[in-house]
Amino acid sequence: MTDQIYYETMYILRPDIAEEEVKNHIDKYNKLLEEFGATILDSQMRGKRRLAYQIAKHREGIYVQLSHQGDGQHIFKIEKAMRLSEDVIRYLTVKQEGPLPTPRSSNKSSNQAEKKENENIDSANKSEPKADETDNKKKITLESSTPELEEQVKS
């Protein structure tokens, strides 16, 4: 058996497709990957976004992200299916170093705890200066003479 490699495929669907059709496309490509021997790790619809440049006369597209694992033989087959589909205007598959990190939503509570801890540290650092620090410094006014200013600059 060959090694299982992690892949991420991002594809863009036409923006004028109905939401039900988008779900059908996602299910279709997920099933195709499973038929070709890949394991689907994650499938996310990223929503409709503005494209950086016009593709097939479209300024927007519906982004879908697939994370999958397989031996690599399934990549050609899934990309061929996307190439033949009129609803897919662009696709890209990249090889990943390893499995994707856990989604941010599951780490939400730990992230909130980190933010509170950072806020506490920031507030402690921003506290007002101590009384003895302010007493040592002499306030300089516009009426101050030049020798006093020079003395302050030197120290």
Swiss-Prot record:
InterPro entries: Ribosomal_bS6 (IPR000529), Ribosomal_bS6_CS (IPR020815), Ribosomal_bS6_sf (IPR035980), Ribosomal_S6_plastid/chlpt (IPR020814), Transl_elong_EF1B/ribsomal_bS6 (IPR014717). Residues 103-112 have a biased composition (Polar residues). Residues 113-141 have a biased composition (Basic and acidic residues). The keyword Transferase does not apply. Pfam families: Ribosomal_S6 (PF01250). GO terms for cellular component: cytoplasm; ribonucleoprotein complex; ribosome. It comes from the Bacteria. Binds together with bS18 to 16S ribosomal RNA. HAMAP family: Ribosomal_bS6. Belongs to the bacterial ribosomal protein bS6 family. This is Small ribosomal subunit protein bS6. It comes from Prochlorococcus marinus (strain MIT 9515).
